[in-house]
């Protein structure tokens, strides 16, 4: 896969920030880069960064934003935790090593006209066992890397109050969870969805 050089440089620079768990992280990245759709998966089926490598670009954007927010609001969180949760928060969107979660939608233009509305470029792979994105993220990552409670909470609850299941953590979010949620939303709704230019 030919990744945009700027994206690759940003990605590689962020990976170097993981130092205390460098070996675990390197093994995880090797697995993701060589056995999964991590480098090619879209970030969504029809919205932000709905294109090849969109998930990787989104994860890099979130990591960079999270580091900036952390610097300003809560410098006690280390670089390593920021990069790890940013890279893993939507990891479940890759699906499984042998099956992607998001598949190209091969609906013909004629069929699309029959629907009377635009057809999403990607569709969900219904052959995979249903797991929420955060649960699949942990399922994929935990065999390779140990996570702190705060990192686990951040990954599981990064969608904040947008998800009904997350109500149980309301008012009990760690600073890392709050910052990841904001970095994720900022990028998905403002930067990547084009609102910056509206």
Residue ranges and their predicted role:
Residues 43-51, 57, 69-196:
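Divalent metal-dependent catalytic cores for phosphoryl transfer on phosphate-bearing substrates
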Residues 1, 197-198:
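C-terminal end-of-chain micro-motif
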Residues 4, 18-22, 56, 145, ...:
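Generic detection of long, well-ordered alpha-helical segments
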Residues 1-41:
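Non-catalytic interface/linker regions that flank or bridge core catalytic/transmembrane domains
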Residues 32-35, 66-69, 158:
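Alpha-helix boundary/capping residues
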Residues 10-14, 65, 136-140:
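A general alpha-helix detector
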């Amino acid at each position: 896969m030919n990744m945009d050089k700027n994206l690759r440089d940003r990605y590689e620079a962020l990976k170097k920030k993981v130092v205390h768990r460098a070996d675990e992280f390197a093994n995880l990245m090797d697995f993701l880069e060589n056995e999964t759709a991590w480098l090619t998966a879209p970030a969504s089926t029809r919205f932000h960064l709905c294109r090849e490598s969109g998930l990787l670009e989104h994860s890099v954007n979130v990591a960079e934003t999270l580091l900036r927010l952390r610097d300003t609001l809560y410098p006690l969180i280390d670089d390593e935790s920021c990069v790890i949760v940013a890279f893993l928060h939507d990891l479940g969107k890759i699906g499984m090593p042998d099956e992607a979660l998001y598949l190209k939608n091969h609906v013909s233009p004629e069929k699309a006209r029959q629907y009377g509305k635009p057809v999403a470029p990607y569709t969900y792979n219904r052959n995979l066992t249903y797991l929420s994105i955060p649960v699949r993220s942990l399922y994929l990552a935990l065999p390779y890397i140990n996570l702190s409670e705060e990192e686990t909470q951040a990954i599981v609850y990064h969608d904040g109050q947008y998800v009904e299941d997350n109500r149980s953590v309301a008012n009990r979010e760690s600073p890392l969870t709050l910052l990841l949620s904001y970095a994720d939303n900022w990028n998905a709704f403002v930067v990547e969805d084009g609102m910056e230019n509206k």
